Swiss-Prot record:
InterPro entries: Ribosomal_eL21, Ribosomal_eL21_arc, Ribosomal_eL21_CS, Ribosomal_eL21_sf, Translation_prot_SH3-like_sf. This is Large ribosomal subunit protein eL21. GO terms for molecular function: structural constituent of ribosome. Belongs to the eukaryotic ribosomal protein eL21 family. The keyword Disulfide bond does not apply. PANTHER family: 60S RIBOSOMAL PROTEIN L21. The lineage of its organism: Archaea, Methanobacteriati, Methanobacteriota, Stenosarchaea group, Methanomicrobia. It comes from the Archaea. Gene3D superfamilies: Ribosomal protein L21 (2.30.30.70). It comes from Methanosarcina mazei (strain ATCC BAA-159 / DSM 3647 / Goe1 / Go1 / JCM 11833 / OCM 88) (Methanosarcina frisia). Pfam families: Ribosomal_L21e (PF01157).
Length: 97
């Protein structure tokens, strides 16, 4: 059998919650708002599948450059190139200075 090439491949531990984090996420994560230019961390919540960024961006930090619907558009550097990542607020954390 050949290996799969799906979007969630190689994510056995990346998309796994610890025992204390299990269950649904709080509503406050869904209604948090970010401003343009704000730096945010991508922290994927596996209990929310809609609006999930590609798992290869787990742990990346990016700048909010806009909003499309309820999702935010982030500018993320991957190597020498800048990528645009779309994500709902459940998968984002504000950066603390």
């Amino acid at each position: 059998m050949t290996n799969s090439h799906g979007e969630r491949r190689c994510t056995r531990y990346k998309l796994q919650k610890t025992v204390r984090e299990r269950g649904i996420s709080p509503v406050s994560k869904a209604i948090q708002e970010f401003e343009d230019g704000q730096m945010v961390h991508i922290d994927i919540d596996p209990s929310v599948q809609k609006g999930m960024p590609n798992p290869k961006f787990q742990g990346f930090t990016g700048k909010v450059i806009g909003q499309r619907g309820r999702s935010y558009i982030l500018a993320v550097r991957e190597g020498n190139s800048m990528k645009e990542v779309f994500s709902v607020p459940q998968h984002l954390k504000p950066q603390k200075y």
